[in-house]
Amino acid sequence: MTNRLVLSGTVCRTPLRKVSPSGIPHCQFVLEHRSVQEEAGFHRQAWCQMPVIVSGHENQAITHSITVGSSITVQGFISCYKAKNGLSKMVLHAEQIELIDSGD
């Protein structure tokens, strides 16, 4: 089964860094995406806020460069978890992160 998502956007919540009891570092933030997509011959505004989690030592170095307002592209897989309120929430598990040069 294929489960692959590539999403570009702007970090809209301060990254939260934690280390699990087993010593695995995690970084969580929310990525906001806005674009215009073509569907059935019409232009459509696309918008979402996607929770992202970066786990493991491999990508932690780049997470220290990520702040609110950073433009990034994230590649990974999506999964759901049950929130404290009992509702299912989708999250993007990042496997690759690329900072987008703002051109400044």
Swiss-Prot record:
Keywords: DNA replication, DNA-binding, Primosome. Residues 1-101 form the SSB domain. GO terms for cellular component: primosome complex. InterPro entries: NA-bd_OB-fold (IPR012340), Primosome_PriB/ssb (IPR000424), Prisomal_replication_PriB (IPR023646). The keyword Lipid metabolism does not apply. PROSITE patterns: SSB (PS50935). GO terms for biological process: DNA replication, synthesis of primer. SUPFAM superfamilies: Nucleic acid-binding proteins. Belongs to the PriB family. Involved in the restart of stalled replication forks, which reloads the replicative helicase on sites other than the origin of replication; the PriA-PriB pathway is the major replication restart pathway. During primosome assembly it facilitates complex formation between PriA and DnaT on DNA; stabilizes PriA on DNA. Stimulates the DNA unwinding activity of PriA helicase. This is Replication restart protein PriB. It comes from Shigella dysenteriae serotype 1 (strain Sd197).
